[in-house]
Amino acid sequence: MEVTVKTLDSQTRTFTVDAEITVKEFKTHISSDVGISPEKQRLIYQGRVLQEDKKLKEYNVDGKVIHLVERAPPQTQPSTGGPSTSSSTSPSSSNAANVPGAGAPERNGNSYVMVGTFNLPHVMSGLGEASRGPRVSTVSGNDGSTLDVHINLDQQLPVQSEPRVRLVLAQQILQDIQRILDRLEGQPVNEQTAEPMDTAVSEGEASSRETLPQTTQNTDGQSNTAPTSHPSPSEYVEVLQSLSRVEERLAPFMQRYREILSSATSDAYENQEEREQSQRIINLVGESLRLLGNALVAVSDLRCNLSSASPRHLHVVRPMSHYTGPMLLQQAAIPIQINVGTTVTMTGNGTHAGQMPSDGNAAHTPTNTSEPQRSNSDNQPPSSGERPASEIPPTSVPHPHPRVVRITHQTVEPVMMMHMNIQDSGPGGPTNIPPPTAGHGGSAHIHMPGLPPEFMQAISHQITQQAVAAASGQQIPGFQAPPRFVFTRPAAPSFPPQPGVATTPPGPGGATTAVPGATVGPAGNASLAQMISGLVGQLLMHPVIVAQGGSNTPSSTSTPTSTSSSSSSSSSTVTTSTTTTSSTSFPTVSSGPSPQPPPGTDQHLSQLLGSLLGTAGSGMSNFAMGSPSITVTVPGMPAFLQGVTDILQATQTVPVSTSPPQSASQAPPPSSPSPPPAHSSPPPAAAPESLPPEFFTSVVQGVLSSMLGSLSAADQSGTESIAAFIQRLSGSHNIFQPDAEGPGGFFGDLLTLICHNFSLVDMVMLLHGHSQPLQNLQPQLRSFFLQEYLHQADPTPNNIQMASRNLTNGLEEYIRESFASVTVRDDVDITRTNLEFLQDQFNRITTHILHCADSTFGQRLLEMCNQSLFEWLALNLYCLRGDQSALTSVINERIRRLSLDVSPVLVSWVTSVLSLRLQVLLGQMPVTEGEIQRHIRRVGDVPQAPEASSQDQPMETTPVDCQNGAASPVPATTVEEVLFLPPQSSVPTICTDSEHPTQEDTGSEQWAASVPPEWVPVIRQDMQNQRKMKQQPPLSDAYLSGMPAKRRKTMQGEGPHLSLSEAVSRAMKATGAKPESSTDCVRRELDNSEAQGRYREQLCQDIQNILQDNESYSAQRFPNTQRAFRGDP
C-alpha cells in the first residue's frame, strides 16, 4: 500500500510498504526519513492514534494522509538515594544527543512565562570536542521546590555515584602525590629544568580529575541497579590509610620546606646548586600540599548514616559542584552563574580549551571559603608581590576540563547570584585574578574596561520586571528607588602596578567590592563593540533577578573581575559557585597608585563614555582631568530595553523611553485609534565627542546577533528583514501579504512595506533616535504614498487633505467602540476629536513625505511622528479627565481585540510592557493642555461642511478609498475588494464630497428604503462586521476524509471562482511588483471578457495537465472533475 505521512513542518513523504506491516514496524521504517525515533512517533489518522500492535491495513490508510507528531518526553521521576540531603538524591536522567528539555514540576499554573531561550550547541560551539555528546539529567529536592537540570558535556564515565567518585578521585590524587614524592626522593637534580612544565601537567591532570565528581553526579540514576556503585565505609578507611602513608612520606620534606621558608627572607643563596635544590623542594612540596588539600576536600564530605539498615554505604553532604567555578560562555569569555526565582539558574565549570586559567579562577581549584582557609592554615602564605601562578610557563596548556552546565529551577523566594570574569589575554593583563567573593544582600558588580560596573544589573532588572509582569498578568509599580549607574574608568599602566590595600565602607546594599589588579586600556571600537554585544546578548538570553539598589565602587583602577551576591536570605537551596551565601561583607582590595593613561587613550575613553552616556560637558571633563568615576541617577523605568537604552544612547542627553518595535515612520494602526508609544521626543544632534554611528550600529547588530543567533541561521549579517525573519521562523510565506486573512488596506500595505525594508537593527536604531533607516526608506515611502495614498494623483494640498479624510473616516467605528467603556468629559466629542486630529497629522506627515527631498527627511519625519504621539496621548488624557488608567485600558483593550489569535501569555506580556511604558511616558509628558486645546471638538459644535455633506454618501459609489465614515469599508477590507469597485475615469483623482454620485443615481442602497429607518444602522454595522470576518482556511485531508459523504457533496464547488484581476492583484502583492500604469488601468484591462475567457481556458488546461500527471487520480473515483474542468461550466 502507499501511505503519505505529513509532519508538523508541513512536509509530506510518501512510503510504499507491505499491507501486512504493523504500525510499530511502519514507524521503524519511516524513522530514518522523518528524523524521529520510533518510540517518539505518534501517528494520527482521522483523529485517532494508531496503535503499534495493530496492522496498518486495519486503519484503511492506503492512499491516505497520516499526520505524524513527536511524542513529548516522559516526565522524569527522582528516586531516593539514601537518608541524605536533597543534593544527594539520586537523579533520574534521560540521555539525548540533542539536549532535550528535561521534565520539570508544575510551574505554578499561569505564573510561568518564557522570556528568553538559548541554544546549547550554539553557546558551546567554541568548546570544540568537549561539547560533543551532551547528556541531560535532573535532580529534585526533597520538598519539590527545586529542580536541578544537569547538562553533561563530558564523556560517559564508568562510575555512577558521587561517593564512589570521591574515593576514586582521592585515590588518583594520592597517586599524583606519590609520583611527586618519588621525584623528591630520587629524581636527579639536572632534570629540574623540566619541573615547571611537569608541575603544570600534573596540575592539569589533577584539575581534570577533580572535576570528575561534578560530571559524574549527573549520570546518577542512569542505572537503576548498581549495588557496587555506593562504596562501603571500609573502602573509605583504605583511602584514609593511604592518606596517612602519604603524609608520613611527606613529613621529612615538610620539615625541610619549613626550614627553607623560614630563612627565605634574608638568605643570599650564593651557591646556585643549593638555591635550585631549595627552589625545587618548594615547588614540589607546594604542589603536594595542593593535591593533598584537594584529596581532603574530596573525602571530607563523605558520611555514613549509622541509623540506616545494613549493609550501610557512604553518601555526601554536599555535591562537588558546590566547590566549582562558573563556566565560560562565548563572546568575550563571560563566566555567568544566574539563579532566578521562577526561572532558571546556570552554573558550571571549565574554560576554553586553549586558555590558561589563573590560580584564582581555574575551574579545577575548589574556591569555597572553607578550602582556602584550610589551605592557608597548612601553608606559609606567599609574599605580597608573589603570584602563585608564576610557576607555570605561558606555553603550558592544561588538559581539557569536563564542561558541565547546571540549571536550577527555583520556585521559592527569588535569589540572584552572578559571577562574571572577562579574562585578559593581552600583554600587561593580570595573571592572577583572586577568586571573587560574595556579600549577603548586596548588588552585583561587573567591572569591565570601559563599561559601567552595574551595566548588567540595570538591564537584568528591567528584563526581570517584565518577566514578572507577564507571569502575573498584572501591572507592576515603579521601583522603590531608582537604579544607580556607576561608571568607573580603568587605568592603562605601562608597568605592573605596586600592590596595595585600600578598604571602602559597605555600600547601600551592605556589600563592598573587590577590585584587585590592573587592566589594560580600552581596545578599539570594533573589539569594544564586540565585547558589549557579547555581554548584552548573553545577558538578554538569560533573564535574571538582581538586588534592589546599588553599591559604591572605589576610586581606583578596576579589573575584569566581579563579585557575587545574593538578594534573598530565605532561599538557601542554591549557593554561589565561589563562596557561601552566609558571608555578609568582605574587604576591598585595590591596586595602589597607578599612572594616568596617555592623552590619546584618555581622549578615546572620554569619547567612548560620551557616546555611551550621551553626555558631553562637565561629566566628560571629569574624565579628562583624571577623575576615576562618575555616578548618574536615572528614573526607575521597568521596561524591557530600558537598561540598553540608558547605556547605549549615543546621541541623547537624557534617558529616553522606548517601546516594543513599532516604526516611527508608521502612522497609527488602522484598527487602533490609540497607538502604542513608538519613541519619545526627538533627540538633539550628536555631541562632538560621540563615536560614529557605525559604532552604535555594530553594537546593536552584535547584540541582536547574540540574542537571535540560534534563530538566525539563515542570516548572521543582521540585514535580514523583519518579514523574512518572521516568515522563516513561522514557516509560512504569506504573513505579510495582504489578503483575506491578513492586514488589508492602506495600513496593511504600509506595514508590509516597513517589515520588508527594515531589519531588526534598523528598528532598534529608530527606537534610539537614529533616523538613518527612515532616510534610506525615502524613495519607497514616496512611491508608496503616491500610489496607495493619493492613487497617482498630484500631491496638491487639496488632494492630500481629501485622501486623509477618506482614510480616517474608516476609523470612526473603531474610535467609538474603543472609548465606549471609559468615562469622557461631558462636553467633549471624543470621536470627532480623534478623527480630525488624525486627519491633521496625516496631512502633515504625508506632505513631508511627498515634498521633502533633502538630507533632513528622516530626522524631521521621526520628530513629527514623536510629536504626533505625545500630542495624541495628551489629547486623549485630557478627554478622559486625566485618568491614566482609563487611557491605558483603551490601548490594552484594542491590543487584545487585535490579538485574539495570539497566545494569551504573549498578549499579557505586551500589555504589561505598554502599561509600564505609558506610566513613564505620561509622567514625562512634554505637551501641555494648552497646546492641545485647538484639537478638541465640543459636543454641539457645528461640524465642518465637507464632513456634514459626506455623512450619507454610499460606500459603493466611491473609487478606491474615497469612502466616508458610516459606509466606508473597514480597515480589514483587502485591497482586492476595493480594486473591483467601478472606475470613475481613466485618470485617478481624489474625489471631493461634492463629486459623490447621489443614491438615486446609483441605486446601490435601495434596500434602505424598504426597511424601517432604525434598522439601517444595524444592518450597516452587520455588513461591516461580516467584512471583518476571516475566510475559513482550507480543510485538511484528514478532516475531509472523516466528513460524512452528504456534507462533502454540499461543500463541493463549481470550479475556481478566482477572477483574473484577483489573481494578478494577489501576485503583485506577493512579489512586490508595481504596474507601470495605474492600478485602475490594469484592473480594467483584466476585466475584459476576452481576457477572462482566455484565463479560464488556461486555468482549466493547467489543471487538466496536473490531473494527467497525477498517478493517484482516477476519473471513476473523482467524476466531478470532468464537469468542473473539462466541460463547459
Swiss-Prot record:
Could you tell me which PROSITE patterns the record lists for this protein? UBIQUITIN_2
Location in the cell reads:
Cytoplasm, Cytosol; Nucleus; Secreted, Extracellular exosome
Write out the biased-composition intervals (Low complexity): 73-105, 553-593, 655-666
This entry's Gene Ontology molecular function terms read: polyubiquitin modification-dependent protein binding; proteasome binding; ribosome binding
Residue span of region Disordered: 69-108, 187-235, 347-402, 490-518, 550-606, 654-692, 942-967, 987-1009
Per UniProt, the keywords (alphabetical) are:
Apoptosis, Chaperone, Chromatin regulator, Cytoplasm, Nucleus, Secreted, Transport
Cellular component (GO) terms are: BAT3 complex; cytosol; extracellular region; nucleus
One Pfam family here: ubiquitin
Q: How does it assemble?
A: Component of the bag6/bat3 complex.
Summarize the protein's role: ATP-independent molecular chaperone preventing the aggregation of misfolded and hydrophobic patches-containing proteins. Functions as part of a cytosolic protein quality control complex, the bag6/bat3 complex, which maintains these client proteins in a soluble state and participates in their proper delivery to the endoplasmic reticulum or alternatively can promote their sorting to the proteasome where they undergo degradation. The bag6/bat3 complex is involved in the post-translational delivery of tail-anchored/type II transmembrane proteins to the endoplasmic reticulum membrane. When nuclear, may also act as a component of some chromatin regulator complex.
Ranges annotated as biased composition (Polar residues): 209-232, 364-383, 947-956
Q: Name one GO biological process term.
A: negative regulation of proteolysis
Name the domain of life this protein comes from: Eukaryota
- Name of the protein: Large proline-rich protein bag6
**Compositional bias segments (type: Pro residues):** 667-686
Q: State the taxonomy lineage.
A: Eukaryota, Metazoa, Chordata, Craniata, Vertebrata
Where does the Ubiquitin-like domain lie?
1-76
